[in-house]
From Swiss-Prot:
Principal location listed in the UniProt entry: membrane
Protein name: Potassium-transporting ATPase ATP-binding subunit
Membrane topology: Multi-pass membrane protein
Annotated positions binding ATP: 361, 365, 393-400, 412
Domain of life: Bacteria
Record key words, sorted: ATP-binding, Cell membrane, Ion transport, Magnesium, Membrane, Metal-binding, Nucleotide-binding, Phosphoprotein, Potassium, Potassium transport, Translocase, Transmembrane, Transmembrane helix, Transport
A Pfam family reported for this protein in Swiss-Prot or TrEMBL: Hydrolase
Similarity remark: Belongs to the cation transport ATPase (P-type) (TC 3.A.3) family. Type IA subfamily.
Gene label: kdpB
Residues forming the catalytic site: 324 (4-aspartylphosphate intermediate)
Class of this enzyme: translocase
Enzyme Commission number(s): 7.2.2.6
Function: Part of the high-affinity ATP-driven potassium transport (or Kdp) system, which catalyzes the hydrolysis of ATP coupled with the electrogenic transport of potassium into the cytoplasm. This subunit is responsible for energy coupling to the transport system and for the release of the potassium ions to the cytoplasm.
GO function term, MF aspect, one: ATP binding
Amino acid sequence: MMRPVVVKEKRVNESHIHAVEDEVRQAKTMDRDIVKHAMKQSVAKLNPKVMIKNPIMFVVEIGFVITFILSFLPSHSSSIPGWFNITVSLILLFTVLFANFAEALAEGRGKAQADSLKQSKKDVFANVVKENGEIVQVSATDLRKDDVVIVKQGEMIPSDGEVIKGLASVDESAITGESAPVIKEAGGDFCSVTGGTMVVSDEITIVITSNPGKSFIDKMISLVEGAARQKTPNEIALNTVLTSLTLIFLIVVVTLPIFTNYLGFQIDTAVLVALLVCLIPTTIGGLLSAIGIAGMDRVTKFNVLAMSGKAVEAAGDINTIILDKTGTITFGNRMAHTLLPVGNETIEQVGKWAAISSVLDETPEGRSVIEYVQAKSISYNRELAEQGEFIPFKAETRMSGVDLQDGMKVRKGAVGSVIEWVRSQGGTIPKDVNQKADFISKEGGTPLVVAVDNRIYGLIYLKDTVKPGMRERFEQLRQMGIKTVMCTGDNPLTAATIAKEAGVDEFVAECKPEDKIAVIKAEQDKGKLVAMTGDGTNDAPALAQADVGLAMNSGTTAAKEAANMIDLDSNPTKIIEVVGIGKQLLMTRGALTTFSIANDIAKYFAIIPAMFTLAIPQMEALNIMKLTSPLSAILSALLFNAVIIPLLIPLAMKGIAYKPMSSNALLGRNLLIYGLGGVIVPFIGIKVIDIIVGLFI
């Protein structure tokens, strides 16, 4: 009896295994294609017009050309065999090719992502609503900004837009990778839709917000392909320093023959070129572009779209993070937990008016009030509310409700706002309102006051919970020297309770949109870089003001245009990971720069004795590695200089291991690993290569 079940399970498992194997096979095939393309591009990039963009590697390429030409000319030095020049030129050629390969490999990963995005741009047609109401079918490429389009179940959304009518489930897996459909509806902060996604239920009317070539997917393709990539300020500054070092060493090498002639001996041109290449920071010069491209690639793989490399770098330098409480620190599903009447009112009266104020309220909180009242079997007149005029919640008023046909006004909202509203109606405030509001706040809940005209009936106790692990994450940020500030519309007591439970450093209670800008500016005035998340139109000014603004893909077009990063998963807590990726990018660049410059110490001890020992025997004392011969020493240093670039490509692409700790601790750790390591590794590497080279010369 059990045998068929076992067989079925086995088949299911085998099917799953085959699916996984197919995915692995496809990934390996794609990686092979990327490597093949990178190998071709590494040769194509030898074009001087391309190479001159990287001055360090351009100097190496010139060195290759010089030594290659010299290999066909008669040698004037009896100590330099004929094969030496061609060997040096080949090593220099591979040094340049390895650097080009690193950059092409990083670019290739971006192009692979771009190709998958291009597949989502299918040739679709749109049902455009003309001004006279006529519906005309046109190609998506003919759509223009402000066109009105109807999209039905099973149809592809033709271009970016905002829902102006209806409600529908939309499959955004082509963009976000998330298979679960999301709800899009007119009004609010979840009205934005993206071209290339599909309506899986119902029907919506949208207004197009972008012209052809300017859509969200077009921007993504441009960014991941690198077409829009520009060097960041830090990258330009480092490149300037490295180029200056190269120029200094070039002057030293060019003037060196003057001094050697004075001392009575000459140095072969190929040896001078080898000295120059070993002195200049070729390792970081060859990997610098790859590090920057790979940094943006890591952010993209994390399902975050960075509008520029500058945004990623800025994330690594962040000092303060502004976080919304709801949805970021807490789950955001505040549900009606209980009702508390005030004065001589009854729980039935509170429930009745709370329900009437929530009938037309489609927010999770509003629906939870209706569910709670129904669960408690409290009666209320639903038709009375449906016939009234709904007053939606606004950040400025901090309350919502309904104006009934008989003139009565029902409101629910923040304690201070409703009390002020009741007083403006000429009402009096029950003594126990603030007492019960404080009780709810101390419990970590959110109190909403229910009032009708000039009379307060009671409070709704909304309960929310802090996401697990938030305290630990904030502690990690604290270790990195990053301050966290929680912004919430809750009253100070509720905000203080949540802030203490979550472990944030500071909080701003009863926060309005303009207050966020004030907080950001206050931090920036102290010389700090600020990051924040947001999804609504009212968040747009603050997102634009912040140094790193992370907008949610589910949010409004205004928010996404104001931000310099967009989270395709619409997960506000991801700002913490984005900061980590930014720090990893900066650390990787700094660590490999340290390693590259530290390498020079070992190269000095290899090449300097090799150049001068014949003329100045005392220089042999510097040959602490006991290298086989002068020629072997020069070739070993050059070979190590070339080979170290491809060996470090995985580290440049993946980024160095990152652990949350203070800046001083990170500096000490990286100096120990990459500074001291940069000194020791080449000593070992050059010696091993010398032993191998010594077998052939």
